[in-house]
């Protein structure tokens, strides 16, 4: 028994000894399967698949795998830095695709660790302090971002497969984002260097350290766009709240930026720069139009070379600045790629900084800081091949009235390719006739400046969109007055003899006109063609007496309103003349305008609001304008929407406006392509 027991113990000891000996083998390292499985949710799967240094703060799975293949996941690449990047560059065991995409992300990781100067911004997104000097980390930071751009560029266009062959791969989207971000950051760095006088070399060449940037020729921007930006803002850094409902972009290649210019109109509430004040004095009196002072742009860095080695050693990239409204695709090394664009950022930033809402009320009541003449804003640089879509706001309003209208229209590719949006900003305290006359003169100046021969597409088939009082002005632009307005006012208005004489001498040129030949279609939105009841009520008359006309107006044609006396509207000098009085249904002017014949060559449409869905349509109103005043019996179309007076912002109204514009394009044999 003792022998048997000893044999059992010996055999057991032998088995454990063998198992311990075999413990180093992979198959017997543990008591269980060598591969285990666990379930993940779809969200976790997508996060693992698409997460990278930008979205999660950690390297992507693709880069981690490449580091493992190269044997760099431990040791030199245990923490981010230049040694890891140099080791990856020296690796000979990974494909170029994997190497370049991983190096782009590793350089990005390194760039994000470098300190950046902190700047404080106001609620409107404006930097509180200007860049006056560059920090000590400027050059290393620029070098890192340029390396990101170059490695990403090499991956996209100079590795084993073309960009089209990788079209549906998540990795290509990641690397494209690295390139776009790197170009964005490098562009801002370049602008800061320019602003501080650090840039050296000729105007078309900028040298910063090892890099020489070659400025590519412009792709046709107008002369207005040659202004120097006072600020360069990445569109991706902006977040908008308030009434703006959406941000519209086009995915693609390039950095989306907003170039903030000084506003020559001086309409913004914030103080203009010294340069703007100097130019404003010389331009405001003569130039009543300008481009929107915050145009969007897309920037590319193009690295030269016939092969991968040449691209990776190109320290003289070409800097291309594109207008995304003009250019939708670019050719890079024989491949057509879409150009990235942000169609909302520049427009929204302009409105956010303008303080138009307060200024329009100051203007109406004659407060300090208002405006006294109309100004035409072009939402993009003038394009001779795009027709004009001109928007005119209403009483006590401003371009802010069109924030969602313009934004939603410009998301439509066909409308964006066919039209360029212009908006009038005008003092709504002025008599309607004077605003209309000033706008006509402005349009004449603009077309004469850009198209003296009148042959450009932009000079023909304009579409007008007018809201409320802006619709009345739009109607005047397509009407023939003859002597009707002057005769009617002389016959019906309660005027003194002095007022009548002033009307004949100074008023007649303003009240006599023909249809604007450029206009072929008009959309009237909540327009009081025959005035309103509200303007004639006690409250309306009281508000009307608070309206203050600019002194320059009082000294000119508006003296008609005050018996030749430069006096505020106090109700003691006969016929009152201001915008609110003009909208009274019993006002001789608005009644005369309603009888003017509109051009038979012009198509017109009505978008009308009713505050309540119940009741007969003929007895409804939008809170201010009754249906009987906004209805036109011979309109091409009429759309009635349950809404308040600001119906232009309602989604059904924008949808109807898009329908009308597409109908217009079809009528002109245009598809927007």
What are these regions (language model features)?
Residues 25-389, 398-404, 420-423, 666-673:
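Flexible, membrane-associating and regulatory peripheral segments of lipid-active enzymes
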Residues 112, 116-191, 195-196, 391-395, ...:
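Serine-dependent carboxylesterase/thioesterase catalytic core
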Residues 396-397, 428-429, 483, 528-530, ...:
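Short, solvent-exposed loop/turn segments at secondary-structure junctions
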Residues 403-419:
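Short amphipathic alpha-helix adjacent to the substrate-entry channel of hydrolases
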């Amino acid at each position: 028994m003792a022998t048997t027991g000893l044999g059992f113990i010996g055999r057991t000891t032998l088995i454990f000894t063998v198992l311990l000996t075999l413990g180093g083998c992979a198959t017997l390292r543990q008591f269980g399967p060598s591969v285990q499985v666990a379930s993940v949710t779809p969200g976790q799967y997508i996060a693992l698949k698409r997460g990278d240094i930008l979205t999660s703060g950690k390297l992507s799975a693709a880069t981690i795998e490449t580091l493992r293949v190269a044997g760099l996941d431990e040791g030199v690449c245990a923490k981010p830095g230049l040694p890891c990047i140099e080791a990856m560059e020296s690796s000979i065991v990974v494909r170029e695709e994997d190497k370049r995409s991983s190096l782009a992300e590793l350089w990005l990781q390194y760039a994000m660790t470098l300190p950046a100067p902190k700047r404080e911004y106001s609620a409107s997104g404006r930097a509180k302090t200007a860049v006056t000097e560059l920090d000590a980390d400027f050059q290393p930071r620029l070098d890192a971002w340029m390396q990101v751009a170059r490695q990403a560029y090499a991956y996209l266009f100079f590795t084993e497969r073309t960009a089209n062959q990788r079209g549906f791969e998540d990795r290509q989207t990641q690397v494209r984002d690295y390139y776009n971000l790197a170009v964005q950051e490098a562009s801002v760095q370049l602008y800061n260097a320019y602003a501080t006088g650090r840039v050296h070399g000729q105007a078309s060449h900028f040298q910063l350290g090892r890099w020489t940037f070659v400025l590519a020729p412009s792709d046709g921007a107008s002369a207005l766009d040659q202004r120097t930006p006072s600020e360069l803002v990445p569109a991706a850094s902006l977040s908008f709240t308030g009434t703006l409902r959406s941000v519209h972009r086009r995915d693609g290649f390039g950095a989306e930026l907003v170039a903030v210019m000084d506003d020559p109109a001086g309409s913004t509430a914030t103080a203009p720069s010294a340069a703007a004040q100097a130019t404003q004095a010389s331009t405001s009196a003569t130039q009543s139009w300008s481009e929107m002072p915050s145009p969007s742009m897309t920037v590319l860095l193009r690295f030269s070379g016939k092969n991968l080695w040449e691209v990776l050693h190109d320290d003289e990239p070409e800097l291309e600045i594109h207008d995304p409204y003009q250019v939708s695709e670019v050719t890079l090394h024989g491949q057509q790629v879409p150009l990235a664009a942000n169609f909302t950022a520049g427009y929204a930033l302009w409105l956010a900084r303008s303080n138009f809402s307060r200024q329009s009320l100051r203007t109406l009541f004659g407060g300090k800081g208002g405006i006294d003449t109309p100004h035409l804003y072009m939402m993009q640089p003038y394009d001779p091949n795009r027709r004009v879509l001109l928007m005119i706001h209403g009483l006590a309003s401003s371009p802010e009235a069109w924030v969602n209208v313009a934004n939603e229209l410009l998301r439509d590719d066909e409308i964006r390719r066919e039209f360029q949006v212009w908006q009038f900003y005008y003092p709504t305290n002025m008599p309607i006739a004077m605003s209309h006359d000033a706008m006509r003169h402005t349009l004449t100046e603009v077309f004469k400046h850009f198209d003296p021969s009148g042959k450009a597409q932009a000079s023909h088939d304009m579409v007008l969109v007018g809201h409320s009082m802006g619709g009345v002005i739009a109607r005047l632009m397509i009407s023939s007055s003859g002597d009707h307005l002057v005769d009617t006012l002389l016959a019906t208005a309660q005027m003194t003899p002095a007022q009548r004489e002033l009307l004949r001498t100074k008023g007649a040129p303003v009240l006599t006109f023909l249809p604007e030949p450029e206009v072929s279609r008009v959309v009237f939105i909540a327009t009081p063609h025959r005035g309103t009841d509200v303007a004639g009520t006690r409250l309306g008359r009281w508000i009307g007496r608070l309206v203050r006309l600019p002194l320059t107006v009082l000294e000119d044609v508006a003296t008609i309103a005050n018996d030749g006396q430069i006096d505020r509207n106090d109700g003691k000098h006969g016929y009152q003349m201001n915008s609110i009085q003009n909208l009274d249904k019993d006002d001789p002017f608005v009644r005369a305008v309603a009888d003017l014949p509109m051009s038979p060559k012009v198509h017109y449409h009505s978008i009308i609001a009713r505050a309540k869905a119940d009741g007969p349509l003929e007895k409804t109103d939008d809170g201010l304008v009754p249906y009987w005043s906004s209805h036109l019996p011979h309109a091409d179309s009429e759309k009635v929407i349950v809404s308040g007076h600001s119906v232009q912002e309602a989604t059904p109204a924008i949808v109807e406006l898009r329908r009308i514009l597409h109908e217009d394009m079809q009528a002109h044999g245009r598809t927007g392509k």
